[in-house]
Amino acid sequence: MQISFEEEQQIFHLYNDKISYVIQVEKQRYLKHCYYGKRIKRWHSGIKDYYYDRGFCANPIAEDRTFSLDTQLREFPESGQGDFRSPAYELEDRNGDKNARFFYNGYRILSGKIAPDGLPHVYTDADTEAMTLEITLQDKVRNQRILLYYTIYEDAAVTRFAKWINDGTEPIEICRFLSMNMDLPTQEYDVLTLSGAHTEEKNVYRRPLCADSVTIESSRGTSSPQATPFIGLLSPGTTEEQGEVLGVNLIYSGNFYGCVQCGQYGTIRVQLGINPYQFGWQLAPGTSFCTPEAVLVYSVNGLAGMSNIFHRLYRTRVCRGWYRDRERPVLLNSWEGMYFEINEEKMLTLAEEAAELGIELLVMDDGWFKGRNTDTTSLGDWTEDKKKFPDGLQSLAEKVKQKGIDFGIWFEPEMISRESDLYREHPDWVIRSPLYEPILSRHQLVLDLSNPAVCEYLIDAVSKVLVPGNISYVKWDMNRHLTDLGSAYLDRKNQNELSHRYVLGLYQVMETLTERFPQVLFESCSSGGGRFDAGMLYYMPQTWTSDNTDEVCRLKIQHGTSFLFPTVTMGAHVSACPNHQVGRTTPLATRFAVAAAGNLGYELDLKKLLKEEKKEVREQIAEYKRRRRTVQFGTYYRLADSFQENQSAWNIVSEDGMEVIFTHVQILARSAYRVPVIRLKGLDPDAVYTDCETGQEYGGDELMYAGIRIPRIRQDFSSTTMVLRKS
């Protein structure tokens, strides 16, 4: 990868073998976005497409009526200078003046990666993996600087963030500060977003961009199940394999805002960053503020190409630590099998049964701590319930491990119950208005993580449970969103900082704990996939994808999640039937087929399984272990879309290309059966592949071009799985 600067024409060119990103300095002041896309050798600097004398446009350079900021393709636009589209940043001084004039004031080209302070980001293992461009914008009147950071890698990705520095003598308030802005010259795109609801996360929405705007956002305190900080721009007709795709994703776990805004002259503006709603940051003299990092991915190979870039980047350069490259264990979670009805005897019986089936990790979910028999009490009091565990938690963990199985535990550290010792001792640690009774959700309140004392308490409380070393896994949950925004810790002028400071506090807590316990596998959760984002993956390398364990619903949820996140980050469980969320009954084989497309787990009462079902589960687990490396670290391809069809299908190709796992799920059986033809992807067309079960041989070109015909099965929710070996 390289970054060049052409002095005469003031052109920056970031490029590698796959992509180019071009920026030009206009009028010695303004940054113009020129190009982001397939690699080009040079940019013709004479292009002046947007220089016209247009009526009703402001002219910042009085003698040039052809130049207006409202018509230009901008890189990081301000407000108040005649560009009436959405700005990337805004401020307000102590006199209420919101005007600012940041102009270009220099650059640096650096080897390696510059990281945003205190925030998750794409990292590098060596400086040779990346190059970074730092561009300085300065308001000399206010004595303020904004540094724009662009990092390019070997893959088709660029990361961006911005840093605001107050060099003046007076404080200012940052009212809006986005991570990225990019203006594009045409509106000929489809827009792809991932939205949904609790237990219906990451639904795929695609629509043509018209002469209006598309906005995505969360103001819930987290990235949320209702929205995802992602925007995809697709050239018309783009498919999984073909077409241009520009994908933008934010590495952040809090409130976010994104938009695709249509301009009056056929251009568009793409933005992503912290949601300016209820946001403000007091920037004192001599201090700075960093935005979260945005990831920009470009693909000429359709949606699959975009996903593969995100998958490689997030698995190897966002996920970190001991488990980054290690296979994840097959687990049994106690929640749907027992709910709050747990004790030492039941857990030991469960451990023995689980070990006999080949399960490697027993996770004790909610209900283990002092007085926790319902969801109305005890959050915050992270000590074991002596009535349920008279010999203590560590004794239980040791006994479980003696049965040949690891032990994990559930926490919800960010929450507090009114009926708890912690609340009685520290009622001021709760996020709430000083005027009103706080609103409950799931009978619980949210701890104020902007307060360092709260963060230290959480680190200490979780550490006391983990220090003895018998617990190898933590499920970190968050089962409500933020309301009644108010902090007893923050000053009045800093109250609008609360939502962002909450996220910064959370990141600091997780950074400390994951460094302190590097061999504990942390899995994040927020009532399922309510905080499934790249920010959380920086600290916890896998996420519980959804609280909805129905395999038919999971087809869509996991399909949508796969646009950004690799299979090894997705928790997926086989649960009981009828399903506890929707009441549907589905075959055990199909439940396994869907769950086996992620980190496999089981979430049911093993005692209720019939003898033949236990035999089937034992065989499932053995089969998954045989192919686990391929599932978790292979390249994933979507083949059929259950949002559009009565089926879903995918295949995964191992890292070395020697193994292929193909899965097809029929949703509803039909009398007038249409034989599905599914074309596999990512194979070697010149190779021969052998079906490991039947011995049948296929050509790679046959599987990819002619495809596989799925025979008729007269049963709803049926599945077919084929494991192929390359000869």
Language-model region placement:
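Aromatic-lined carbohydrate-binding/catalytic grooves of carbohydrate-active enzymes
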Residues: 323-460, 473
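Glycan-recognition surfaces
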Residues: 417, 422-456, 500-607
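Conserved, mostly hydrophobic/aromatic
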Residues: 18, 162, 286, 332, ...
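C-terminal beta-sandwich/jelly-roll accessory domains of carbohydrate-active enzymes
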Residues: 668-727
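Carbohydrate-binding surface patches
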Residues: 231, 642-684
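Polysaccharide-binding surfaces and accessory modules of carbohydrate-active proteins
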Residues: 5, 9-13, 17, 31-261, ...
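Glycine-rich, aromatic-flanked loop segments that form ligand/cofactor-binding clefts
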Residues: 70, 75, 80-113, 240-254, ...
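Short Pro-Gly-centered flexible turn/kink motifs
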Residues: 97-104, 281-300, 718-725
